[in-house]
Amino acid sequence: MNTPVNLLDFDVDGLVDWFAGLGEKPFRARQVMRWMHREGCDDFDQMTDVAKSLRAKLKEIAVIRPPVPVRDSVSSDGTRKWLLDVGNANAVETVFIPETNRGTLCVSSQAGCALDCAFCSTGKQGFNRNLTAAEIIGQLWLANKLLGAARDAAADLEAGEKDNGRIISNVVMMGMGEPLANFDNVVTALRLMLDDHAYGLSRRRVTVSTSGIVPAIDRLRDECPVALAVSLHASNDALRDRLVPINQKYPLRELMAACQRYLERAPRDFITFEYVMLDGVNDQEAHARELIALVRDVPCKFNLIPFNPFPNSGFQRSNAERIRRFAGILLDAGIVTTTRKTRGDDVDAACGQLAGQVQDKTRRTVRLKQSMEVR
């Protein structure tokens, strides 16, 4: 028996092509797409305006299957984190951050991460595999369902109010994994987020965060430009080589040039640089002045992130006064600078704390133990 096709794996064009293979017209694909994403429906029998014969056919050959939630944690500040089973003993984490005027969903793109940034809990777990498009968009599908938002979002779309009154108004690809290392599946999910037959989010409200894979930044600019955030975290190559090892392949000069090129087509007129504040590592006044020189030709804003500790990280958070002074130097240079409010740290849902459950294929744990052995 053939494995059923998971329809969450398709963007609109892909679903139209798949339906064409069944001898069905494009409008049928769009009907099913709306039921899946705008109504949050995973039961073909409930798709009442779809022909009964097609519903019967779909039940035999297709499914609508998001990841399976295995744990639901709610922080004292209202942040909500789901642990989602993606098979073969792997699980990823998705975080919803409610605020007064918006709700942001933080989505994972990989089971683990191979980039091994020094201060990130996900990287310490190693890497297993890329998530499928269904597993990525399924996080938004599932969060809408669990938050009771699917039908509300559909009503907003019908009323022409695309961004008002939604529970999830913003999506950030800032969960587990490096999104641009899983380019094709991430872009399929992004297209669904943007498409009016699915979620209809504004490009300005969808953000991809990258550690700096330069060729993929250029490709994203050409294929699906959304808001871009760059995990910078260092003001010079020597320090960034240590904190963000991908810098050894794509150093800061190349990364800054890629950011300039991206802005030619970006929905926002600036790049967001994320900068984790590590006590005594990258938080000195000299680092701030190096940053000013580094980004002088890149319209940008800085988001300073107080480090969120995790076991055996080896780092400490910069104190509040040091962060305030660091931000002040950037602000005095005319750079918009914010300090991220830590959310969800009591359920390990804060930035840098997501770990999930990863069956490492990189032997990272073995290599780490070997490096710690007394020789």
From Swiss-Prot:
InterPro entries: Aldolase_TIM, Methyltransferase_A, RlmN_N, RNA_MTrfase_RlmN, rRNA_lsu_MTrfase_RlmN/Cfr, rSAM. S-adenosyl-L-methionine binds at G177, E178, S209, S231, L232, H233, N308. It catalyses: adenosine(2503) in 23S rRNA + 2 reduced [2Fe-2S]-[ferredoxin] + 2 S-adenosyl-L-methionine = 2-methyladenosine(2503) in 23S rRNA + 5'-deoxyadenosine + L-methionine + 2 oxidized [2Fe-2S]-[ferredoxin] + S-adenosyl-L-homocysteine; adenosine(37) in tRNA + 2 reduced [2Fe-2S]-[ferredoxin] + 2 S-adenosyl-L-methionine = 2-methyladenosine(37) in tRNA + 5'-deoxyadenosine + L-methionine + 2 oxidized [2Fe-2S]-[ferredoxin] + S-adenosyl-L-homocysteine. It is found in: Cytoplasm. GO terms for molecular function: 4 iron, 4 sulfur cluster binding; metal ion binding; rRNA (adenine(2503)-C2-)-methyltransferase activity; rRNA binding; tRNA (adenine(37)-C2)-methyltransferase activity; tRNA binding. The active site is at E93, C351. The keyword Membrane does not apply. Residues 99-346 form the Radical SAM core domain. Keywords: 4Fe-4S, Cytoplasm, Disulfide bond, Iron, Iron-sulfur, Metal-binding, Methyltransferase, rRNA processing, S-adenosyl-L-methionine, Transferase, tRNA processing. It is an enzyme of class 2 (transferase). CDD domains: Radical_SAM. Its EC number is 2.1.1.192. Its main location: cytoplasm. Its cofactor is [4Fe-4S] cluster. [4Fe-4S] cluster binds at C113, C117, C120. Transmembrane segments: none annotated. Binds 1 [4Fe-4S] cluster. The cluster is coordinated with 3 cysteines and an exchangeable S-adenosyl-L-methionine. Pfam families: Radical_SAM, RlmN_N. It comes from the Bacteria. SUPFAM superfamilies: Radical SAM enzymes. Belongs to the radical SAM superfamily. RlmN family. Specifically methylates position 2 of adenine 2503 in 23S rRNA and position 2 of adenine 37 in tRNAs. m2A2503 modification seems to play a crucial role in the proofreading step occurring at the peptidyl transferase center and thus would serve to optimize ribosomal fidelity. This is Dual-specificity RNA methyltransferase RlmN.
